[in-house]
Amino acid sequence: VAHDCRLGNHIIMANAASLAGHITIGDHSVIGGLTGVLQFVRVGDYVMVGGCCAIGQDIPPFTFAAGGYRAHLYGLNTVGLQRHGFSADRIASLRKAFDLLFREGHRTAEAIRLAKKEFKGQADVAKILAFMEGTKRGISRAVSLDTEREFDQQV
């Protein structure tokens, strides 16, 4: 862990996970082994990052990221959310928001605008939107649904 990092409560960093300077890791997040996080990156609350990957852009709250050279979003951290007591309805709402923000092909600003309208009053979605609006390094992109399905079959 390098200089000026802010680490949330109840995080797990596996073997040889490395944080460069000025990193923020949210509460209840997991960073897999042999994962490197570049300087100034933010990792949101309840995030799961798989092992052996590099993170160069922000990872939004409640998501799962993985992938060698550059981590991409593979969807929600569903297992982690369930383990922390998130209801099925709450997870379904987050999944719907994830799809709008990352799967429907909107530019980021347009996706945020649409999500603010559709999910008004939903605190979890508001947390994602505020996180995205506060990015300085950009937000990691999602893989295609086909790639996500292939990954799910392997796990």
Which role does the model predict for each range below?
Residues V1-A71:
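Structural signal for interior beta-strand "rungs" in well-ordered beta-sheet cores
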Residues G68-V155:
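Terminal amphipathic alpha-helical/low-complexity segments used for targeting or macromolecular assembly
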